[in-house]
Amino acid sequence: MPAYNPSARFDKAPFHSSLFQYCVIPKRLGVSGRRQVRNHMSIDNYVIGDQVELHEATSSKVKKVSSNHRTRFTQGVTMRILITGGTGFVGFQLIKLLSSHELLVLTRDLTKAAQRFAHIPSQNLQLLSPLDELSDFNGIDAIINLRPDNRLPINAEEKPKAGIARSRLDITEQLVEKIRASAHPPAVFLSGSAWFLCDQQAACL
């Protein structure tokens, strides 16, 4: 596989937009019948991989984007990608999909991560804990942030909404600080989240 050339990558990038967000729903992820939970990633830049359904979300409609562009900018190149929360439900599937690239995976539990990713060649995987092991993000092509605390309470009193929001903001702020400290920052930053639908929405949010 040829080396990745960042200077040639974004000349005609198909998905860049400051006005829209994109919902990326891995085909293999379903909906829980009991809790009616659907996972998604909100993306405001680019999308990696060919096993996704890509939709452009607007206020009035959802329009499917042509699948011809899904992997146009990653075909035939090796990228260096930082992924946070790689041992989670979405992250684990994503890492399997991107295993041919050079992956840096930020995880809370190095032992658990090493076991889950034993099938990935060691030269393609570097496990990190904590993020401070990296002083900056020079040489990293993309960041995929999947690390927010998704262990939601049974009811809002057990963990206030502000705490849930903070769990999603802290890691993002740390990543942004290191991006700013980089002379050659990553060209792509993706940040994931999830929505929850149930009969008593107040208890889920």
Swiss-Prot record:
<dbReference type="Pfam" id="PF01370">
    <property type="entry name" value="Epimerase"/>
</dbReference>
<protein>
    <recommendedName>
        <fullName>Protein Rcp</fullName>
    </recommendedName>
</protein>
<dbReference type="InterPro" id="IPR001509">
    <property type="entry name" value="Epimerase_deHydtase"/>
</dbReference>
<dbReference type="InterPro" id="IPR036291">
    <property type="entry name" value="NAD(P)-bd_dom_sf"/>
</dbReference>
<comment type="similarity">
    <text>Belongs to the NAD(P)-dependent epimerase/dehydratase family.</text>
</comment>
